[in-house]
Design a protein with these regions (language model features):
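N-terminal and secondary-structure boundary signal
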Residues: 1-251
Length: 251
């Protein structure tokens, strides 16, 4: 069996042409037949809350723009969505993060996972609700942010899948799984259920977060952009580069 490939690019800043070149190289790992066959792509950023890009809490819009342009050049219908946390409304989050401007510029279909319907799946007796949008697109691009996390130590690609869970349900899962181990087990179950729906994952680590992440830490310039079709390999590699050992990350 071939080992999964993790791509790493050293990128100093949010320069669109440079990131476009990296993204195009990353997507060479997607089978050309799949890109040709699928007409609709879902791009799922990290939209944790209403934070401006310089706060380094959410995926930088320039990284997302590079991905959007790649698929628009191939005449794909692009869906763009997430289920933000916190008390701010979806529109406020989308506007503050710089995502609304992208959606308007490129005429994207914006999906609020909290209101657009969900499916209830089951993993070994554990019911988990996820957005229906995940099952309505042939290509799904998962775009996380490179950060520390107070509960899970590290957040990258796998933790970003939690955004497929509708907003109020996310709050309920935090109540049901309040400690590190139970929450990590829930994340692993979520990955087991939907991981095969994710075509490719990218982690925006050009500027990430250190300290008390995922939202209260300090922006830190790492100058890295990661990509892989394998979420476990991607997170393992990115976490090790950040300085974590395997035992430090509970999932």
């Amino acid at each position: 069996m071939n080992r999964p490939v993790v791509e790493i690019r050293k990128i100093d800043g949010y320069d669109l042409p440079v990131i476009e070149e990296a993204v195009a190289d990353f997507f060479l790992k997607i089978k050309s037949q799949k890109i040709t066959r699928c007409k609709r792509v879902l791009i799922k950023p990290n939209a944790l809350g209403a934070y401006s890009p310089e706060k380094a809490v959410t995926t930088h819009p320039i990284v997302l723009e590079a991905i959007i342009r790649y698929f628009q050049d191939r005449n794909k219908e692009i869906w763009f969505g997430d289920s933000p946390g916190g008390s701010m409304g979806f529109e406020t989050v989308w506007q503050t993060c710089g995502f609304a401007a992208l959606a308007e510029k490129y005429h994207l279909k914006v999906i609020n996972f909290s209101t657009a319907g969900f499916k209830e799946l089951n993993y070994k007796g554990l019911p988990i609700k996820v957005s229906e949008a995940l099952f309505q697109c042939g290509l799904v691009i998962n775009v996380g942010k490179y950060k520390t996390h107070q509960l899970t130590a590290f957040t990258g690609a796998l933790k970003n899948l939690f955004g497929f869970v509708p907003g109020l349900v996310k709050s309920e899962y935090h109540r049901l799984y309040p400690d590190t181990n139970s929450f990590a087990n829930m994340l692993v179950s979520l990955y087991a259920l939907i991981g095969n729906r994710i075509t490719y994952s990218i982690i925006d680590g050009i500027t990430g977060m250190d300290g008390t992440g995922p939202s209260a830490g300090k922006p830190h310039h790492f100058g890295l952009l990661f990509g892989s079709p394998s979420i476990p390999a991607l997170d393992y590699t990115a976490a090790r580069i950040m300085g974590f050992q395997l035992k430090d990350v509970p999932y």
